[in-house]
């Protein structure tokens, strides 16, 4: 069990009043708040160690480089990668997935297929649309059954034509957690490369990329109590060796001639220019913070909150919840609509009560088209949320329903 009240003291942003109400922050799927440990680590880096990495021999440069590479090792341990060669720092999940799709362009040919699902974030759709457009490959979608991934549909479409499978570990709308280990086995049976968008899973559960046996795994720092502008791409070494750099410039080179150049070894051949040093170090601080709490404890806490709030939400007349009703398949994300009330109006009404939620298509328009809704509201939970926050959400929804009664 988490001591949430102690945890909340580490997040000063939560201690504020919004519209004369205590802030209840339930937009964690969009971004999470940052603990003092992360803020202080970043501040200390800029105050004491700020210098460019891998370049200078002076003490500041050596300290900065040591901290930057120590951060890579922290991430390696956190996701259980086999080597730091397999851990690339990027700007975030979007960048990571774009890099993999660019690699796919080197492999795909006309008649090949890429398999994704209808629940994907745009960052795991558009790069594949582009890769298929450029190569003549076909983008194939797996659809849903009872609010979760239709595994029968996946098995039927997973043929030897499929060269890449790219799926969200957890949906940022439905909250469903996909059986990635099982899907990876199926993908490898037909020789496909398995790519996972881990943006919505890595902050909330223990990740072991070797146990999952995935070929690529992407996630972002800002969704797991870390800073913005930093993310990670894990890739199996054999694929990263084949993969061409996406960006070119300083630091990723071994030697430059007038008409050609050679690249550094992994992982540095992918990290051109001055990297986000403070971001990487801040992300490592976030990982340390989360691991002190315990990833199993974090997952259990969020499951407890969902089990508590879900039936209360179901009891609100006119409220529609999207996704599987099997709570064992769900993460701490709940998308919903209240009657015919537009989600933006609903989110605005909740904000008047101090409750911060997301409203819109959540960068998942194909999913919402499939669900036949233009948008939803979304509440998403994290380590600092409480059952009192759940009660406040339910109370605010009831007040909103009463205020708009008769209009939907």
Residue ranges and their predicted role:
Residues 1-408:
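Pyridoxal 5′-phosphate
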